[in-house]
A protein has these predicted regions:
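Sec-dependent signal peptide recognition
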Residues: 1-6
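Intrinsically disordered, low-complexity N-terminal segments that are enriched in acidic
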Residues: 9-61
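Short intrinsically disordered coil segments
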Residues: 36-39, 66-73, 189-192
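Generic structural motif
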Residues: 39-46, 152-154, 209-227
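N-terminal accessory/assembly segment that mediates macromolecular interactions
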Residues: 53-75
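Secondary-structure boundary elements
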Residues: 67-132, 140, 207, 217-227
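Hydrophobic/aromatic-rich core segments of domains that either
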Residues: 139-215
């Protein structure tokens, strides 16, 4: 049901804005700083005992990404055969970037299984073995976006897994996609969407090297926006 609601929001004139305020006991406050783009904002406050972080996101509205879609022949030729084939499948019938992103999501959902094993995470390797973790998902999606001339960058941080009001920050990787007109959006190839359950880490701080920390939910809210 949740996946269906996210799909309907992604393709409707409506978007969902979610806000999550958390307190985390991180002993490395230099790991985080304020950050924002077109579908996410993170504001960090140092408080006694840790950090209070205000997180706000908007549902990724694929319907609004009606940018022209075209294969970049030179970029495509530079990719391994497995990536070229994946590009053809993900882009089948696509007329816009929104179509292509949806195609990438469907392709990954059907062709790549999540696996935490210590396997190669390069795009071609993940496609060949049919499995990978968040780094592999991000690498495949980044390669497929490059095939159509869309720049992106990997983002390191944490996904906030929640249970009974407490949050467990899990090391994670996703993409920031650069759109025409200077717009930037987050896209998570593994979870197929983006929400306020993320903490963005500063560059140069691999999340997996950070001492495990935890937190609690301070407040939350959601609202539907008609755009």
């Amino acid at each position: 049901m949740r996946a269906l609601l996210l799909f309907l929001l992604a393709w409707s004139p409506l978007s969902q804005e979610s806000r999550l305020e958390v307190f985390v006991t991180c002993r490395a406050p230099e790991l985080f700083s304020d950050f924002g783009n077109d579908n996410f904002r993170q504001v960090v406050h140092a408080v006694p005992g840790g950090l209070r972080v205000d997180l706000k996101s908007r549902t990724l509205r694929l319907r609004g990404l009606n940018h022209r879609f075209a294969v970049d022949a030179a970029a495509l030729a530079a990719q391994p055969e497995a990536v070229r084939q994946a590009c053809a499948q993900a882009g089948q019938g696509a007329l816009s970037l929104s179509d292509y992103l949806r195609g990438i999501s469907l392709f990954l959902r059907n062709r790549v299984a999540y696996d935490e094993a210590d396997l190669p995470q390069g795009a071609a390797e993940v496609l060949a073995q049919g499995k990978g973790h968040c780094i592999g998902y991000a690498n495949v999606a980044q390669a497929l976006l490059a095939c159509v001339g869309v720049a992106s960058r990997p983002v390191n941080g944490f996904f906030l897994r929640e249970a009974r009001g407490r949050v467990e920050p899990v090391p994670h990787r996703w993409l920031e996609v650069f759109l025409p007109g200077g717009r930037r959006i987050f896209f998570d190839p593994q979870y197929q969407d983006f929400s306020s359950r993320y903490l963005v880490a500063n560059a140069g701080f691999p999340p997996e090297s950070v001492e495990r920390f935890e937190g609690v939910v301070v407040s939350r809210s959601k609202k539907i926006l008609d755009e």
